[in-house]
Amino acid sequence: MGMLELVGEYWEQLKITVVPVVAAAEDDDNEQHEEKAAEGEEKEEENGDEDEDEDEDEDDDDDDDEDEEEEEEVTDQLEDLREHFKNTEEGKALVHHYEECAERVKIQQQQPGYADLEHKEDCVEEFFHLQHYLDTATAPRLFDKLK
């Protein structure tokens, strides 16, 4: 197992244990309800005009049941913010440096005698620079959304 894979696995485990699951913002929740209402109206139009009053009453009851059964897909606001900041100018530079380092390490690992090397390059420094930037950039916005 390479150093990058080990760091990646460690990071994923750390995120799972440390990062709390964040509920969707009220705006996202309202948008999802509006989309579901629009879908319900489309279904009613497809059913035809026969006994419209009876169909609407039945469809309303069915929609309520479906809403309860369907699990709403909640997006993690932290991940959304991280992706946003990875695409900023500073974020792109840090991601680029990390990916370059990862490529160098991957190439070194494939060369013979890698296991015997005294100093093996890892990308811990680049990784932590990237994570530090993402954490400091996302934290204020995330907490503002959670208020």
Curated annotation (Swiss-Prot):
Subunit architecture: Component of the ubiquinol-cytochrome c oxidoreductase (cytochrome b-c1 complex, complex III, CIII), a multisubunit enzyme composed of 10 subunits. The complex is composed of 3 respiratory subunits cytochrome b (COB), cytochrome c1 (CYT1) and Rieske protein (RIP1), 2 core protein subunits COR1 and QCR2, and 5 low-molecular weight protein subunits QCR6, QCR7, QCR8, QCR9 and QCR10.
The protein, known as: Cytochrome b-c1 complex subunit 6, mitochondrial
Gene Ontology biological process terms from the UniProt entry: aerobic respiration; cellular respiration; mitochondrial electron transport, ubiquinol to cytochrome c; proton transmembrane transport
Species name: Saccharomyces cerevisiae (strain ATCC 204508 / S288c)
Biased composition (Basic and acidic residues): 79-89
Gene that encodes the chain: QCR6
Other facts noted in the record for this chain: Present with 4490 molecules/cell in log phase SD medium.
Record localization: Mitochondrion inner membrane
Domain of life, source organism: Eukaryota
UniProt entry keywords in alphabetical sequence: Disulfide bond, Electron transport, Membrane, Mitochondrion, Mitochondrion inner membrane, Respiratory chain, Transport
Region (Disordered): 25-89
Membrane-related topology note: Peripheral membrane protein
Biased composition (Acidic residues): 41-78
